[in-house]
Each structure stands twice: as structure tokens, then as C-alpha cells.
Amino acid sequence: MRLTQGTFSFLPDLTDEQINKQLTYIVSKGLSANVEYTDDPHPRNSYWELWGLPLFDVKDASAVMYEISSCRKAKPNYYVKVNAFDNTRGIESCVMSFIVNRPANEPGFLLQRQDFEGRTMKYSLHSYATEKPEGARY
């Protein structure tokens, strides 16, 4: 099951050339970028691990691409994403986020249903990947 999080998530994986064009756009708008990775793909897992330091005031997309390549090399079976942060007063939030690396095998999720009082059903998602210990999931 393909993980769909962030911008471009329903499109085929971006090529390095396409990623570089997006990074050029991010830099041209004066946004800060950072690279994050995780092996816990749950949709509510918003706290991914930060790769290096955030890239403030970067003027060249190749610096961000270098960090992506380094992260991919060190964490080949992890999800890796790029976030673009706008520090403009009044916005001050992530304005773009997209996945640039994913594991070769994405096992998907188990939908757990639970009967509750008054014939109510409660649902929860469980990632098959998290059945293995952290660092050995893919």
C-alpha cells in the first residue's frame, strides 16, 4: 500500500530532476527547507526525525539536494521528506511537504474495528511495519 502524505502524494514518485525543480521553487520564494525521515508511516505520526539542521537562507537548491542524497544513502529503507517553511509574519508554518524516498516494500495498514456502547463503531489504524522494532521495520 502506497503511503500518501504531502504534496504530490497521488502522483508517481518524483525524479531527482523534478525534486530539484521543486527545491529551486522553494529557494526562489525565500522559504527555509529541512529534510526529515521515519520508519513509522502512520498518518498521525507528524514527528519525523530531523536530518541535520534546517536549511535557513539557502540560495542554491543543490545544498538541499545534497542533504536529501545524504539522508537517502544513510537511510535507504526509510521514508524521507522535504518540508518548506515560510517564516513570514502571520504565516509561520510549513507551506509545502513532499516525500522524496520510500521503502521498496510498503506493507500497509490494518483497520481495527471496535464495537462500542450504543452500537457505535470505533476505528483505528495500525501500521504493519510497526510490528517490528524501530530501525528494523523495512
Curated annotation (Swiss-Prot):
Coiled-coil stretches are none
Q: Give the main location.
A: plastid
What's one GO-annotated cellular component? chloroplast
Q: Which domain of life is it from?
A: Eukaryota
Identify the InterPro entries for this entry. RuBisCO_ssu (IPR024681), RuBisCO_ssu_dom (IPR000894), RuBisCO_ssu_sf (IPR036385)
The keyword Plastid belongs to this UniProt entry's keyword annotation: yes
Q: Which keywords does UniProt give here?
A: Calvin cycle, Carbon dioxide fixation, Chloroplast, Photorespiration, Photosynthesis, Plastid
Biological processes, Gene Ontology terms: reductive pentose-phosphate cycle
Intracellular or extracellular location(s): Plastid, Chloroplast
What does it do? RuBisCO catalyzes two reactions: the carboxylation of D-ribulose 1,5-bisphosphate, the primary event in carbon dioxide fixation, as well as the oxidative fragmentation of the pentose substrate in the photorespiration process. Both reactions occur simultaneously and in competition at the same active site. Although the small subunit is not catalytic it is essential for maximal activity.
Q: Which family does it belong to?
A: Belongs to the RuBisCO small chain family.
Listed name of the protein: Ribulose bisphosphate carboxylase small subunit
Q: Which organism is it from?
A: Pyropia dentata (Red alga)
Q: Which gene encodes it?
A: rbcS
